[in-house]
Amino acid sequence: MRLAVAVRPPRSVVDRLAELPRPPRPGLNWSVPEQWIVKVRPLGHVAEALWPGLADAVRAALDGAGPVGVRVGPVAERLGGQWLGVPAHGLDDLGAAVFEATAGIVPVTHPQPFRADLVLARGRVPADLAGLPLDVRWTVDEVVLVADRSSPRAPRLADVAVVPLRG
């Protein structure tokens, strides 16, 4: 099952996201509120036996870490032509700590510069959707280990561990 370490936006941000225009387009699937997360570290397919160790590693890495301010915006971008996402800023240190803590359990196979996004749509993303304005901020007070149990019929993301950021 696919797993990620992520942060979830609060209700006020979810409400704002729900107000965005979502024009129907062939081959484009708009994300639903359950899918509105910002991945701090995508982990890929991970055996369920490794989940407790991952959760413990994230807890240990973030022990003593306080809440973090995040800004999602200012506009949506086409990401590889297959996603429409809005960049998330302010999670770099959190991401570095999580990557370092989890690399011994789930190795980093394709190192890339850290980038976090909130994905609004997947599929064939038309170029004219880039530039959709969105500028929201919130304080992240927990990190979640999320299992993606989605099927072609329905998205299903389940939080399997929650790590509070209490500082």
Region annotations inferred by a language model:
Residues 1-167:
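Histidine-dependent nucleotide/RNA phosphoesterase domain, centered on the 2H-phosphoesterase fold
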